[in-house]
Regions:
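Conserved small/aromatic sequence motifs within transmembrane helices
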Residues: 1-186
């Protein structure tokens, strides 16, 4: 909508002015059939480091605007560019970094049988409040049950979840820990 476009423009200008950080964040992700692509998101954190040159924890790097963008899921809005390019769908398992590929069980890897999505079944069933294993089970369930009506349901649940701020990690906690692998579902 016109208002979303104006909000995006203002957010970008404000962020660039206040933080002198890049407005966009790009990261390699895996899509359907393990095809690698670059996902685009709004940058929500600084690159602050400790004395050893290591990045500080997420909670110490997230900006005020970044916190708002994450809590409202607006940081994902640039991902629609990936949808327009055909790398992602609106609905599907959230794309993850390529480094995770060797860590998936055979069953978990089935999440790559379809295009990843901006919104996923796992996100509307717990978002960051559930374990990696639970997310992957939900992703595979979606792969097996994908339908137009399920996608509509996910879209409506996502809007509800954003409005009610359900499944969002509190500001004083890091988001998800890195997925290190599992033996479930081999």
């Amino acid at each position: 909508t016109i208002w979303q476009g104006r909000f995006q423009t203002l957010s970008c200008k404000r962020k660039a002015f206040l933080t002198s950080q890049p407005v966009f964040f790009q990261q390699a992700r895996l899509g359907k059939d393990h095809e690698e692509f670059w996902i685009l998101k709004f940058c929500t954190m600084t690159n602050k480091k400790n004395d050893k040159g290591e990045l500080l924890p997420d909670k110490d790097r997230i900006t005020g605007l970044g916190n708002f963008l994450r809590n409202t899921s607006l940081d994902e809005f640039p991902g629609f560019w990936n949808v327009l390019k055909g790398e992602m769908s609106l609905i599907g398992p959230r794309p993850l970094p390529p480094r995770y590929l060797s860590r998936y069980s055979k069953d978990q890897d089935r999440r790559h049988e379809i295009k990843p999505g901006v919104i996923g079944w796992a996100q509307v069933n717990g978002r960051n409040a559930i374990s990696w294993e639970e997310k992957f089970k939900l992703d595979v369930w979606y792969v097996d049950n994908k339908s137009f009506f399920l996608d509509i349901k996910i879209l409506l649940l996502a809007v509800r979840q954003i409005l009610l701020r359900k499944g969002i990690v509190p500001d004083d906690e890091d988001a998800m820990e890195e997925f290190m692998g599992t033996n479930i579902g081999d």
